[in-house]
Amino acid sequence: MTTFKSKGYEGRIELVHNPLAKWEGVWGIQASQQKLDVTGEEATLAPNETQKYSLFGVEHRQFGDFHVELGTRLDHQKVDVDSEQKDFDGNAFSYSGAVNWDFKPNYKLSLVGSHQERLPLAQELYAHGGHFATNTYELGNDGLDNEKSNNVELGLHYDDDKLSYHVHLYHNWFDNYIYAKTLDQYENFRLIEYSQDKAKFYGTEAEVAYQFNDIYKTSLFGDYVRGKIDSDNAPRVPAGRLGTRINADFDDHWSGSAEYSHVFNQDKFAAYEHETQGYNMVNIGLAYKYSLADRQEAKVFFNANNLLDEQVYEHSSFLSNIPQMGRNFVIGVDYKF
């Protein structure tokens, strides 16, 4: 038996300023503290405490048909660990810029560029031991540096009363991508170490939707991502997907949905991985929503998932050899107050 004891605090203060030279924005500070103590047969982490302090800001302004947004964030993180491994103390600086161009009625073209820095997590720094939930033996790396990436994303949007669509293309370049690298494998049990290497990820995501009438709306969607670490395939990268969905709002209370998607084979796999077969997924749902007093709301729902009872394997999982849930049914209640 393993016991996880986590105690943490988090606070955030934001200041929204009046327009300055037509720039509007918000600045703020954020602070958090977390103590983690893991005991038992799966105690993969020594007791540790993470303190993090952040300063952030976002500014935006309209220039005719162009909307410009700038953002920045400065993080300081300290991780104290109760072991012979060295403590972590570091800073990260991120910034971004975005331009949205309303070049025609109902159309918008967007371009986003950013430099992102991520501080390593305690798990990535200090893990040491068997983690049977992922069927791995994990080795942390207290020599990890900040993960740094330069990113660009291009998007096209269209939206009117009936038809809407969007397409996004993105590319991310990493100087020192942090990932769980498999060093060895016995049957399906892996020895992994948190490592850093140059990497790049690029892909696309798109959706087109059509509102037939006040009740029915249908959409087509798809996404694809490709990951490379140095010249090799990145591990646990999900396969491409295409699908269609129909939503129905029958009245103020009843709604329903049906979705079909096809996930392709993933034949671009990393060392110690294997090809993952694709599958077809069919899900349906029905819900009844009603309002209560004082703005409270309740929704009773029924979902039927994987109606084809497909053998589903997720390449992005550490347990990609274990099938996901087959045909299943869910009944539940959502209550908002």
Where are the regions that the model predicts?
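Gram-negative outer-membrane beta-barrel transporters
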Residues: 25, 170-174, 192-269
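Outer-membrane beta-barrel signature, preferentially recognizing the C-terminal barrel domain
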Residues: 87-88, 94-102, 108, 115-166, ...
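Transmembrane beta-strands of outer-membrane beta-barrel proteins
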Residues: 25-29, 68-70, 109-111, 165-167, ...
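C-terminal beta-signal and adjacent terminal beta-strands/loops
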Residues: 117-118, 173-175, 253, 265-267, ...
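Residues on the lipid-exposed face of transmembrane beta-strands in outer-membrane beta-barrel proteins
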Residues: 11-17, 55-61, 97-101, 154-158, ...
